[in-house]
C-alpha cells in the first residue's frame, strides 16, 4: 500500500512502541463491565473499513509476545478524505450509559513535508443504535456523532528517531441507550492515526455485604448525576431492624454511597464479620436488639446452639414478668421465729424474714387460718368473718393482727413467704405454723336500748343481752351524762338485770345514756348513744316558797344545806365501799340485784386503797390477796435476790387446776416486823390490780415460813436487760406493741388512782409472748435533801433520770409525773436498753432538764414516737398527755404502720438534743479525721475518705444507711458514730440559730 511504501519506518516504529508500551495498559477496574476490548482480541478484529483502502488492520506483539490487533490510517497526501472504520455489533446488556476509551497516536502534520493543505490532526467518533446486526454496509447517515477527537500530544519524525511515542487516551460517554446494541464508527478526514486500542464498557456497583445486608450488582443510572437506590437483603439468620430497612445508593461512577439502615442478627445468633453465627451451648440471645450472646443466667442452661432463652434448672423458675437475663429463682423458705400474742379473741403474729428468699426481692407473706378440733385431729379453713389487719395476703411487713376469732377455740395459723415464682412451683409449701387457743372474749355490744318511762327526775331503761355474750354476764354498766357536758363528767349505774331506773336527774334536761356488759373477760363496747329529755317541772310554787323563806331566814338555808351535804357524803363513802366490793375487791360474792350509783370525774369503777391506811397489815393483805397453802407451791430454783430475800421460780398447783409457772418472793430469815410489813405491803397493792399488762398476784403465804408472795412467772425478765440482750432484733411495730402494753397497764393504774412513782424499764417484766407488764409496787420511797436528788429505799438508791422535774423539786407525784417516766421508758425501749442521759451526773441531768434540753431520738426511732416522748416531757404537767391518750396514739400507729416509717426531722416542734458538758464541741474540729479521733473511731478514717466525706458538713447530713454503706458492720460502732453525728448536727443548728429548746 502507498502508506506502507511511502512511510514504512513509521509503521515499524509504531510496532516497537506497541511492544514497549503495551505493559502500561491499566488493569480492568473492579466497577467496570467490558463490552469490547480490542487488546484482548488475539485474532483479527475484522472490523468494516470503508473505503477498503482507508483504515488498515495490523498486528503486533506485546511484551509477552501476545498478538495485538490495531488499525491505522495515514491518507494525508490527498484532500477530502472520508475513511470510515466500524466495529462489529456490540450488545449493551443491562447498560444505560456506555463509556468508550480510545488509545491512539497521531502524527504532527508539521512533521510531514508537503501535506500542509491536506493533513488533519483530528478524527470523529460516531455510534449507531440497533437491536441486531445490520450487516457489513455502513449507512453513514444513520450514525450519530459522539465527538471530534483531537490528540493532546502528536509525535514527529524526531520522536521516531528517538524511539519516543506519545500515546493519547480519550474517554467519551454514550447514552442513555434504548436499543439492545450499537456500533461504533471512526471517521478519518485526513489524519495520520494509529488506533492502539478501543475499549467499550459500562459501570456498575459490585455486590457487597454491608451491615449484614447483601446488596447485589447494580448498574449505574442513565444520567451522570443519577443515584440508584438499592434495598439490601439480610444475610442468613438476620432480620431488618425495625423501621430501618437496609438501603444503599449506587452512584454514576459505580460506587456505593453511605449505607442507610441495617440488618441485625436474629434471637439466638450473633454477628461475626458479615455473617450471623448461632450462640453456643450455655449461651443465649433473647432478642435481635442484643448485640452479643450472653452466658446463661444462674440456675439456667441451654443445651443446643442458637438458643433464644435458657431453660431453668429443676426446682427453679422464671416468672412471666421476669426478663430472660435474670437468674432463675425458687420460692422462699419458710418464715423464721414466728411468735404470737393472744389478747382474748385477737391474735397478733410476728415473724422474721425467711433465711432464703429464693433469689428474689419481691417476697410477701400470706396467712392461712384454720380452726381445729384437736380431739378429732381435723382442721377446716376459717370463715370469711375473720378480720386481718392490715390484710391476709400480699403482706409486705412481717406482722399481722387476726381479729374476730371465736372465744375458747383452737386455731392454727400458717404463715407462708411467697415470691413471684411461688405459684409456678410444684413443690410442697413451706410455712411456719403456730397453734393457739383463744381466751374468753369480752361481750359484744348491747343492743335494743329503749326508754320505758320518763319522769321529771328519773328515767327507766331496758335493753337486750349482747348477741355474743362470750361468757356469763355478771353485770351491766349504764353511763349517763348531761348532753351539754359532752362527757366531761359522767355517772355510772350498775345492775345485773336488763333494765334499770336512773334517779336523781334534773328536770327539763337532755341526758345521754350508754350501756355495756361485763364478763370475766372485761367490759364490752358501749351501746349507741340514747338521748332522753326529762320532763319539765310541773309548777314553780315550790321554788317560789323556797325563795321567800330564803330571803326571810338565810341561816336556815345554810343549816339545811350543811345537813344535806353531810348525809350525801355519808352515802358516797358507803357507796364507795359497797361498789369496791361489788367490783371484785372482796373475796365474798354479793347477794341480790341491788343497783349502785357512783359519780366520778374520770372513767373506771375501781379505786386504789393505800394499805398504809390499815393499822393491821395482815388485815390489808387478806383483804386484797388470796392466802395459799404452802403445799401447793414447789420451789425449783433461785433466780435472783430481792430487797427482802431470794426470788425463786417454781410451780403452783391449786386443787382442780393445772399447775402454772410462778415467781416466788421469799422473806429472809430474821426479818423485823417493819420488814414483814413492807414485804406484805407490795402484795396488798398488787392484789388490787387485775389487768393483762400488770403483773398478776397469785396469792401469799403468811401462815407459814418462809413468808411468800407468789406472782405470775415472766420468762424474759426485766425489760431493760431483755432489750440489751436482743439489741436490734425487733421490728419497730414490735417495740411499739411493747410500749402499748406498758401504756395500757399504766392507764389502768391511773384510772384506779394509783401513782407508780418508779416507772422504768427495769420495773417492766416481759413474758414469753413479749407481753410487757408493770411491776415493782412495794418500794417505800422518801426523797431526801440530797444534791444528787435520788430516791432512798431500803434496797438502794434509784436515779432521778426517770423522775419528773416537779417530783424532784416539790415532791409532787401524780399520774402526770408517771407520764414523764413513761416517756423515759419509751426512750429506753427504742434505744434497746441504753442508760438515759448516758454517763452524765444526776446534777447535770437536772440542770439540763431545767434549761429545756431533752433526750434526742434514738437511732432509727420514727419521728412520731420521738414527738410523743417530747410530749411526755413537757415542763408543765398539765400539758402532758394522759395515759388514755397515749394508748390511743399508739393504737393508731399500730393500725397504720406507715406512720412509723416517717423519717426523723418531720416533727412539728424542733428541739435541741440534750448535750453533755463533757461532750466535745464538734464545730471546733477542722477535719473529719480529728472528729473520728475524738470519738475513738479513727479506724474508719479511710472509709469516710474513700466515700467522699471530706468535710464535717457532709458528715452532719449522713443517715444510718450512709454509715452502714461505709462497711461499718459493728452495731455498737454504728450507734456511736450516728449518735455523735446527731450531736454534731444539733451543735451546728444551734450555732446557726436554728435549734430551740422545749
UniProtKB/Swiss-Prot annotation:
Annotated phenotype, changing residue 170 to K: In a colorectal adenocarcinoma sample; somatic mutation
Phosphotyrosine modified-residue sites: 608, 614, 791, 940
Boundaries of every Fibronectin type-III domain copy: 331-441, 442-537
Keyword Transport: no
Intervals, Cytoplasmic compartment: 577-998
Residue ranges annotated for the SAM domain, each copy included: 923-987
Record PTM text: Phosphorylated.
Residues annotated as signal peptide: 1-27
Keyword GTP-binding among UniProt keywords: no
Transmembrane regions listed in the UniProt entry: 556-576
Subunit annotation: Heterotetramer upon binding of the ligand. The heterotetramer is composed of an ephrin dimer and a receptor dimer. Oligomerization is probably required to induce biological responses. Interacts (via PDZ-binding motif) with GRIP1 and PICK1 (via PDZ domain).
Annotated protein name in UniProt: Ephrin type-A receptor 7
Protein species of origin: Homo sapiens
Lineage: Eukaryota, Metazoa, Chordata, Craniata, Vertebrata
